[in-house]
Amino acid sequence: MAFKLWLLDEETIYEHVFERYTQLEGQSGKLAQDLGIQDRRGGVLEITFEPSGLEGGRKKKRVRRRNKASSVEEDQNVAVDSYHVSVGQSISSLRSSRDNGNSTTGYVLWSTTPFFINWLLYSTSAAPFRLGSQVEVTCGSSCEGHKLELPRLVDLTGADRGKRGILELGAGISGILPVILGNFVDTYVSTDQKGILNKLKDNIMENLSQLTRKRCISRSLRLELPTVEPVGDADITAASLPSKSTLHLEVAALDWEKINLQDKKTHSLHPELSLIGETCSSVYVIAMDVIYNEYLIDPFLKTLKQLKHWLQTTYNLQFHVLVGIHLRSQEVTTLFLEKAIIEYDFTVYDIVDQVIQESRFNFYLIT
């Protein structure tokens, strides 16, 4: 059964948050009681994603399989490819008071992201994001809702003629979202603060072999399509890639406190954002575990507001946002929803799904 959407408003925010944290408390014996770092013991993590389900995202110890993205018979409803990524992280930078202006959470991989990838690609309930379809909406406590038409977030078949893009905010260093979800979109722009970008680029390049369905071009990563067949290396020749479409993949600095898309001069500083508008008909903004203290909420929501206005008015894009939150502070979650709905006038839906409700995470769709 597909997930449902609960339309939140200024009255139902509190009912939703109370119910979700009550669920969380009832599962305290089953769920890890930690801050959510994927693995704080190692500098390099080996992670496998596979169709066997949400357990596929567990870290694999002492395994170094390279370029092992495999596929079986295609299925429109659930992804069939497997992926293995190697993620270099920096525990020392996480603990540093000097690195990246003391904003250091992005130096490690947080567990919200692997969970989201597994759910999006392999959970049957996430099918609307893979197929593009109408989703049932419940308004408050009433069972009489309506349907919301969702464009595809990812196209598993490659047959959809629509051009789709992903803009990732607060990407951190891992780079696993672009190298996996990049297989199913046309343009992917991964952003974070400037101090994070070198390690983010390193991890993307380390795992570029997982982009098995696309030919990748990138100005920021200095990747171009091959034009001449290299002797003795048939695996990467242009002739060997005739059936693959092209992914535009870029990595860019985006400071939520400084962005000003109303200033025309700013546009020239963010050509990657213009790339999404120029190449896509729909865009999903993805932000995983970026709301963990109250100080980030206003800059984040102001950035979303600017992006929505600019991409819709300038390029007429379909615009949706997916925010993943690791449920830590009930007060921070409540404040985020209050500000998003009441102060910034966003339409916010809780994604209601059993798999999510049995985890420490929650996902919100914002339009």
From Swiss-Prot:
Q: Identify the residues that bind S-adenosyl-L-methionine.
A: 110, 170-172, 192, 256, 288
Q: Does the keyword Methyltransferase apply?
A: yes
Q: Does the keyword S-adenosyl-L-methionine apply?
A: yes
This protein's UniProt keywords: Methyltransferase, S-adenosyl-L-methionine, Transferase
| UniProt superkingdom | Eukaryota
Look up the EC number in the record and give it. 2.1.1.-
Biological process annotations from GO: methylation
Q: Which Gene3D superfamilies match?
A: Vaccinia Virus protein VP39
Q: Which GO terms describe its cellular component?
A: cytosol; protein-containing complex
The family classification in the record reads: Belongs to the class I-like SAM-binding methyltransferase superfamily. RKM5 family.
Q: Write down what this protein is called.
A: Ribosomal lysine N-methyltransferase 5
